Amino acid sequence: MANFTAADVKRLRELTGAGMLACKNALAESDGDFDKAVEALRIKGAKDVGKRAERATAEGLVAAKDGALIELNCETDFVAKNAEFQKLADDIVAAAVASKAADVDALKAASIGGQTVEEAIGALSAKIGEKLELRRVAIFGGTVETYLHRRAADLPPAVGVLVEYTGAGAEAAHAVALQIAALKARYLSREDVPEDLVASERRIAEETAKEEGKPEQALPKIVEGRLNGFFKDAVLLEQPSVSDSKKSVKALLDDAGVTVTQFVRFEVGQA
């Protein structure tokens, strides 16, 4: 008996963009395990798998101040453009700086205007008639470069980046912040990539090469090449620099005498 339902098949289709039969077969092969089903679909070449899985349906904005970054969600872009909603976001990120709240729960308990952040969110939610959610917060304590990006001129920022660094190269740090916003690096260095993710990518590369009919003796070289491609996509220091494609981000930073210690990227509606 199958360990999944028609609703599970529908959900996997929404996550991956693959066809109904492909999703049904992937769930059957994985005994209902969604992660394994997604991996199986990637091996078989389903388009946009993984990318759609990270998506969430949300509107809202990101706001930053003095090394703090928050994401505040609403249901429609109409509310995202609302002045009161934007002011609330500014007040919340200021509260994050003042309270040094390291997570959402701590920030919700922080004070703004004689009430908690959670109470302020609830009050505005009741007033405008939409569900509002403080989704995440990040605070860095060192020297920080901040970049906010708008998807359209009439919308508030939807992408926010914080880059903590050492060294005097503010221009290089800004270039890296733009890089992170555009190319969506997930990890600072290769060593930061979880071992289980590396193992999964290696397995996917090998199985994909086999599906393509590549000769057995060529598999190790092909797998390593594709794994290196994954690292160049996901790891900041290994990405080609957008400001100088002949150099990696690491080379750009080395030339400027800058060391990135950590970074974070928030995008509204993304995991």
Curated annotation (Swiss-Prot):
Q: Which InterPro entries match?
A: EF-Ts_dimer_sf, Transl_elong_EFTs/EF1B, Transl_elong_EFTs/EF1B_dimer, Transl_elong_Ts_CS, UBA-like_sf
Q: Which residues cross the membrane?
A: none
Q: Which gene encodes it?
A: tsf
Q: Which family does it belong to?
A: Belongs to the EF-Ts family.
Give any Gene Ontology cellular component.
Answer: cytoplasm
Pfam families listed in its UniProt record: EF_TS (PF00889)
Q: What is the lineage of its organism?
A: Bacteria, Bacillati, Actinomycetota, Actinomycetes, Mycobacteriales
The protein's GO terms of the molecular function aspect are:
translation elongation factor activity
State where the protein is found: Cytoplasm
- Name the source organism: Mycobacterium marinum (strain ATCC BAA-535 / M)
Described by its record, this protein's role is as follows:
Associates with the EF-Tu.GDP complex and induces the exchange of GDP to GTP. It remains bound to the aminoacyl-tRNA.EF-Tu.GTP complex up to the GTP hydrolysis stage on the ribosome.
Which UniProt keywords are given for this protein, alphabetically ordered? Cytoplasm, Elongation factor, Protein biosynthesis
| Protein name per its UniProtKB record | Elongation factor Ts
